[in-house]
């Protein structure tokens, strides 16, 4: 105790200061320090393991590389899937397209049935390409990938499709008779209908009176002029009550409705031929149409 009192303040501070080990290799601390990595003096407690410590995180967590790549991959719609992928996924028919594809079907399609289950797409191509150019062809498969025994072939030209039907219909392929029918036809543009002459109906009741009564059997005594009397005889029949030729053919105004009274006396009828009557009738028809 007395020794401590005799020591100076600096010596007391130096004696109470705990020796610190260095973090470098082979620390400089006193005591039993063995100089390991991050070691400290014997009085500084157990050494820490810094191997598992990492730097400060910039994010709360990190995703696995594989999961991140799968998440960042571009999503693709089924619209952009190929025919082969759709057929493999849903089991539809496999179709081979010859040449560039088109969204509009322009060829003539044949439907082939009663095929042997061992017939392949190459067999169909080899068989029907001998007739003409093919746009596409294919065997129909079910969901399990087995052939349904049917196929379809699309020819570029309709004439080739008809020739294929005549050549291969009811012909054996691998021991079975093929049944071929046309299901896709090229419909030519419909021909324009022949325009008939326009039929203009005559007015039945207009400013000229009852046209049917005047010309369809009942001649009212007025034919671009006034007849004598109130005749209602038929145009081709015998007049009644004065009728045809009951007065003079005077060039006055024709009456409306039933025949008016003629302005002439009892003279002889003028000789009128059939041609004159036809001409007058045509003229009256023309005036009736212009008036209406």
Curated annotation (Swiss-Prot):
SMART domains: FoP_duplication, RRM. It comes from the Eukaryota. Residues 1-50, 241-292 are annotated as: Disordered. Pfam families: RRM_1. One of its GO terms (cellular component) is nucleoplasm. Keywords: Acetylation, mRNA transport, Nucleus, RNA-binding, Transport. It is found in: Nucleus, Nucleoplasm. PROSITE patterns: RRM. Export adapter involved in nuclear export of spliced and unspliced mRNA. Interacts with RH15 and RH56. Belongs to the ALYREF family. This is THO complex subunit 4B. The gene is ALY2.
């Amino acid at each position: 105790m007395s020794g401590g009192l005799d020591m100076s303040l600096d010596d007391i501070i130096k004696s109470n200061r705990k020796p610190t080990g260095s973090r470098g290799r082979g620390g400089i601390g006193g005591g039993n320090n063995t100089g390991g990595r991050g070691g400290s003096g014997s009085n500084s407690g157990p050494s820490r393991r810094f191997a598992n410590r990492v730097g400060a995180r910039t994010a709360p967590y990190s995703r696995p590389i594989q999961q991140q790549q799968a998440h960042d991959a571009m999503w693709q719609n089924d619209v952009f899937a190929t025919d082969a992928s759709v057929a493999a996924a849903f089991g539809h028919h496999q179709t081979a397209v010859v040449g560039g594809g088109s969204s509009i079907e322009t060829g003539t399609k044949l439907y082939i049935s009663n095929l042997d289950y061992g017939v392949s797409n190459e067999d169909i191509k080899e068989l029907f390409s001998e007739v003409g150019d093919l746009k596409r062809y294919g065997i129909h498969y079910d969901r399990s990938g087995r052939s349904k025994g049917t196929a379809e072939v699309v020819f570029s030209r309709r004439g080739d499709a008809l020739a294929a039907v005549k050549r291969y219909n009811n012909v054996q392929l691998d021991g079975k008779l093929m049944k071929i029918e046309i299901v896709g036809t090229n419909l030519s543009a419909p021909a324009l209908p022949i325009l008939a002459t326009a039929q203009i109906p005559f007015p039945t009741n207009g400013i000229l009176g009852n046209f049917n009564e005047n010309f369809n059997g009942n001649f009212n005594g007025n034919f671009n002029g006034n007849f004598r009397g109130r005749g209602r005889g038929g145009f081709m029949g015998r007049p009644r009550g004065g009728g045809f030729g009951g007065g003079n053919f005077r060039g006055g105004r024709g009456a409306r409705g039933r025949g008016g009274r003629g302005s002439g006396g009892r003279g002889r009828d003028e000789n009128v031929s059939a041609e004159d009557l036809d001409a007058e009738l045509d003229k009256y028809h023309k005036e009736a149409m212009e008036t209406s």
